[in-house]
């Protein structure tokens, strides 16, 4: 079975989506967060591809996908993923989502219960908050970048775009999010700077956050019919920690916990943990 990573493009929901595939067998869909792309799964894909077909898109507006002006709420982005899976001809999939990709994964599973059979979440909750609820001050301080990016996305876009390298270098190496400052190599940082320097990319990313504070809160408040598929939810011990309680609000069958000595970027900080956990969790689907 091949572990070669192949790049593709397809017209999905009216825009050009870039995605990669590898391996063969039962399909697993890997959904990245911000400021990342399919590349965040680079250390995970080869091992998973030995037993599964791996599909890792650049989600709407990020990576090498096109940058549309609208559609950045996570429910719409989940329809992008559904259309990609349909384009590829699959009728059953397992899903792994990290960061905002975890929220997209939630709506993908929630709205497509006959399609998604298992859900693996990494350091993300279903949505930032339900409409009408309030952020506890300690949580708001920990995730303060969310309010910078999403509170006034046009202003944030203008400021970040002045020096994408400076901003992302700080974002990716600070101990605010990582257990270690050495998670990302210079090559890794350069790749994330490259894709986030493409025209429209920073705007798209800030819109991910803006909708997270607006449309997504309304959608989450309406998501009252719990998932019944198996869900595992693991947060980094030095960022969100044990995220099971948040997922138990939207799913009946949740396991997981906190990944020790790990921050937010779990697929890149602890790739072997992700590999081992995914292979065990998705094994019944093979």
UniProtKB/Swiss-Prot annotation:
<keyword id="KW-1003">Cell membrane</keyword>
<keyword id="KW-0472">Membrane</keyword>
<comment type="similarity">
    <text>Belongs to the AB hydrolase superfamily. Epoxide hydrolase family.</text>
</comment>
<comment type="subunit">
    <text>Homotetramer.</text>
</comment>
<feature type="active site" description="Proton acceptor">
    <location>
        <position position="264"/>
    </location>
</feature>
<comment type="function">
    <text>Involved in catabolic degradation of epoxides. Shows highest activity towards C6 and C7 carbocyclic epoxides. Also active towards linear 1,2-epoxyalkanes.</text>
</comment>
<dbReference type="InterPro" id="IPR029058">
    <property type="entry name" value="AB_hydrolase_fold"/>
</dbReference>
<keyword id="KW-0378">Hydrolase</keyword>
<dbReference type="InterPro" id="IPR000639">
    <property type="entry name" value="Epox_hydrolase-like"/>
</dbReference>
<dbReference type="Pfam" id="PF00561">
    <property type="entry name" value="Abhydrolase_1"/>
</dbReference>
<feature type="active site" description="Nucleophile">
    <location>
        <position position="99"/>
    </location>
</feature>
<dbReference type="InterPro" id="IPR016292">
    <property type="entry name" value="Epoxide_hydrolase"/>
</dbReference>
<dbReference type="GO" id="GO:0004301">
    <property type="term" value="F:epoxide hydrolase activity"/>
</dbReference>
<dbReference type="GO" id="GO:0009056">
    <property type="term" value="P:catabolic process"/>
</dbReference>
<keyword id="KW-0058">Aromatic hydrocarbons catabolism</keyword>
<keyword id="KW-0963">Cytoplasm</keyword>
<feature type="active site" description="Proton donor">
    <location>
        <position position="209"/>
    </location>
</feature>
<dbReference type="InterPro" id="IPR000073">
    <property type="entry name" value="AB_hydrolase_1"/>
</dbReference>
<protein>
    <recommendedName>
        <fullName>Soluble epoxide hydrolase</fullName>
        <ecNumber>3.3.2.10</ecNumber>
    </recommendedName>
</protein>
<feature type="domain" description="AB hydrolase-1">
    <location>
        <begin position="26"/>
        <end position="123"/>
    </location>
</feature>
<dbReference type="GO" id="GO:0005886">
    <property type="term" value="C:plasma membrane"/>
</dbReference>
<dbReference type="GO" id="GO:0005737">
    <property type="term" value="C:cytoplasm"/>
</dbReference>
């Amino acid at each position: 079975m091949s572990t070669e990573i192949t790049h593709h493009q397809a017209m999905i929901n009216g825009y050009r989506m870039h995605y990669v595939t590898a391996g063969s067998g039962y399909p697993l869909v890997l959904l990245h967060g911000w400021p990342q792309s399919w590349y965040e799964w680079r250390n995970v894909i080869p091992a998973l591809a030995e037993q599964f077909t791996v599909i890792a898109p650049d989600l709407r507006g990020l990576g090498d996908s096109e940058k549309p002006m609208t559609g950045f709420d996570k429910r719409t982005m989940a329809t992008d993923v559904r259309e990609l899976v349909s384009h590829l001809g699959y009728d059953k999939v397992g899903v792994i989502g990290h960061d905002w990709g975890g929220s997209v994964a939630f709506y993908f599973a929630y709205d497509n219960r006959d399609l998604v059979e298992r859900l693996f979440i990494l350091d993300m909750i279903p949505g930032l908050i339900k409409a009408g609820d309030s952020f506890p001050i300690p949580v708001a301080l920990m995730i303060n970048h969310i309010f910078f990016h999403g509170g006034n996305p046009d202003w944030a876009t203008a400021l970040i775009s002045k020096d994408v390298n400076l901003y992302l270098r700080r974002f990716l190496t600070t101990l605010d999010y990582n257990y270690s400052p050495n998670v990302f190599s210079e090559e890794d940082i350069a790749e994330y700077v490259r894709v986030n320097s493409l025209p429209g990319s920073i705007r798209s990313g800030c819109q991910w956050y803006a909708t997270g504070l607006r449309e997504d809160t309304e959608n989450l408040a309406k998501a009252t019919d719990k998932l019944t598929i198996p869900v595992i939810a693991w947060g980094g011990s030095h960022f969100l920690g044990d995220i099971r309680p948040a997922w138990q609000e939207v799913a009946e069958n949740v396991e997981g916990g906190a990944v020790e000595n790990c921050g937010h970027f779990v697929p890149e900080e602890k790739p072997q943990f992700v590999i081992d956990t995914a292979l065990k969790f998705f094994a019944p689907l093979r």
